[in-house]
UniProtKB/Swiss-Prot annotation:
One of its GO terms (molecular function) is magnesium ion binding. Its EC number is 4.2.1.11. SUPFAM superfamilies: Enolase C-terminal domain-like, Enolase N-terminal domain-like. Disruption phenotype: About 6-fold less binding of bacteria to human collagen. It comes from Lactiplantibacillus plantarum (strain ATCC BAA-793 / NCIMB 8826 / WCFS1) (Lactobacillus plantarum). It is found in: Cytoplasm; Secreted; Cell surface. SMART domains: Enolase_C (SM01192), Enolase_N (SM01193). This is Enolase 1. It holds the Pfam family Enolase_N. Binds a second Mg(2+) ion via substrate during catalysis. (2R)-2-phosphoglycerate binds at residues 163, 342, 371-372, 393.
Length: 442
């Protein structure tokens, strides 16, 4: 048993230049762990609370000194003395100390920083990689990456309503090969955008945010980029996209207002919008759609899942917010067939693991994800392997805070050697073989 002796938090910066919480944790044996907390731009309204100072004279109100103080003055007093390897007890103690359902008192950013630092210190204490500590000897599945290469919606200033357009190297044989395929496609995409006179400046997650004309043009350009890189769309590299539909849902009319449809924009009922998505699925090698409808319209999600869920992966992000209560509701209602996992949506590693396990037991896939405001912390790369989750969403082929996760995955694959497994399209166990074959044959 190794006792936690010291916990210290400080304010550092994320990839957008905004403050975030960094926590360092030490044990009596000298083991050490550090955790840095990410932050989202497009956030679900039911996420755990990210505590910000609100002082407009400092970082435009985005400072996190309150969260830092909560670690140094409150959480440290509670957690010092705990066995560093008892992750569940540490996380539950912080949840109890907070005492709110959404971690509003201490802040999920304070709690998560300690949770990650404790896990890393425990791995250091036991002299094992983090993925082994979290997942045990059976941690061996390397994830298929979702690489966000074109941005729209809240992540860009253009006429594209959907927030993210991603490539997934489903035909690769290893994560190293998948990353190479993604990199080659990314650079060919850049060349195509240059040829068409579009900007190749990159956004928060490393993807391009060109001023595209409508919602279909990104799919056309991605297919061209995949082919120019020497790969077959669908068979080698499939396409995924995140609608982030809550961002363009009109609560007053109950319709989805899309500026990228028609000459002057167009509004759709839920049924009409799902029909539009269905037509995209039929036309392009789509393997996954995230947040196709507003996060509060569960009955519409049922309808969408019934129509699209046998064809493609339907991912709940804002819908589930990595929360087992919402996920259990979705499973019971037959809503979605996949969950996006973001550690800061729920606030502890213990609760994150519980959400992944619940999803897998129900036949849902679990996609471990970054946030738009990231850091050099690579915990999610270890977590996705630890849980054999099989899919990771961690940005494009640019920006060091994104590449750091890919580099860590390649290190892990090297460490696992012949015991590692990359499943590609076969990791979509939420789709039957016929659906997978349809996607890879387009």
């Amino acid at each position: 048993m190794s006792i936690i002796t010291d916990i210290y938090a400080r304010e550092v910066l994320d990839s957008r230049g905004n403050p975030t919480v960094e926590v360092e944790l030490y044990t009596e044996s000298g083991a050490f762990g550090r955790g840095i907390v990410p932050s989202g731009a497009s956030t679900g309204e039911h996420e755990a609370v990210e505590l910000r100072d609100g002082d407009k004279s400092r970082f435009m109100g985005k400072g996190v000194t309150k969260a830092v103080d909560n670690v140094n003055k409150l959480i440290a007093k509670e957690i010092v003395g705990y066995d560093v390897t008892d992750q569940r007890a540490i996380d539950q103690a912080m949840i109890k100390l907070d005492g709110t359902p959404n971690k509003a008192k201490l802040g999920a950013n304070a709690i998560l920083g300690v949770s990650i630092a404790a896990a890393r210190a425990a791995a250091d204490e036991l002299e094992m990689p983090l993925y082994n500590y979290l997942g045990g000897f059976n941690a061996h599945v390397l994830p298929t990456p979702m690489m966000n290469v074109i941005n729209g919606g809240a992540h860009a200033n253009n006429d594209v309503d959907f927030q993210e357009f991603m490539i997934m190297p489903v035909g690769a044989s290893s994560v190293k090969e998948a990353i190479r395929m993604g990199s080659e496609t990314f650079h060919n995409l850049k060349a195509i955008l240059n040829e068409r006179g579009y900007s190749t400046a990159v956004g928060d997650e490393g993807g391009f945010a060109p001023d595209l004309k409508n919602n279909e043009e990104p799919f056309e350009i991605l297919v061209e980029a995949i082919e120019r890189a020497g790969y077959k769309p669908g068979k080698d590299i499939a396409i995924a996209f995140d609608c982030a539909a809550s961002e363009f849902y009109n609560e007053e009319t109950g319709k989805y207002d899309l500026k990228g449809e028609g000459e002057n924009g167009q509004s759709f009922t839920a049924e009409e919008f799902v029909d539009l998505l269905d037509s995209i699925v039929d036309k392009y090698p789509i393997v996954s759609i995230e947040d196709p409808l507003d996060e509060n319209n569960w009955e519409d999600w049922q309808m969408a899942t019934a129509k699209l869920g046998k064809k493609v992966q339907i991912v709940g992000d804002d819908l589930f917010v990595t929360n087992t209560d919402y996920l259990a509701k979705g499973i019971k209602m037959g809503v979605a067939n996949s969950i996006l996992i973001k550690v800061n949506q729920i606030g502890t590693l213990t609760e994150t693991v519980e959400a992944i396990e619940m999803a897998k037991e129900a036949g849902y896939t679990a996609i471990v994800s970054h946030r738009s405001g990231e850091t050099e912390d690579t915990t999610i790369a270890d977590l996705v392997v630890a849980m054999n989750a099989g899919q990771i969403k961690t940005g494009s082929m640019s920006r060091t805070e994104r590449i750091a996760k890919y580099n860590q995955l390649m290190r892990i694959e090297d460490q696992l050697e012949s015991t590692s497994e990359y499943k590609g399209i076969h990791g979509f166990y939420n789709l039957d073989e016929a659906a997978r074959n349809t996607i890879t044959s387009k």
